[in-house]
Amino acid sequence: MKKVSLGKIIESTVEDKYTYRFVRDQKKPNLGEYYKTFESIRAGQHSSTYDVVGKRDYTVVDKLVKKC
């Protein structure tokens, strides 16, 4: 099984859904749009358990975006 970082999974998921749902001519959404889109996807998938385990840590996503 190929190892893939969590940040890469989040980035690709959000980018695919963002470009499919919204603007197709924009290359990449900015960091704020990543957070909003990722939060809405996660809240929709786990509406009954949303925020039960505490606040999410986005440091991995921040580091990934800074590298790009």
From Swiss-Prot:
Pfam families: DUF5470 (PF17564). InterPro entries: DUF5470. It comes from the Viruses. This is Uncharacterized 8.0 kDa protein. The lineage of its organism: Viruses, Viruses incertae sedis, Naldaviricetes, Lefavirales, Baculoviridae.
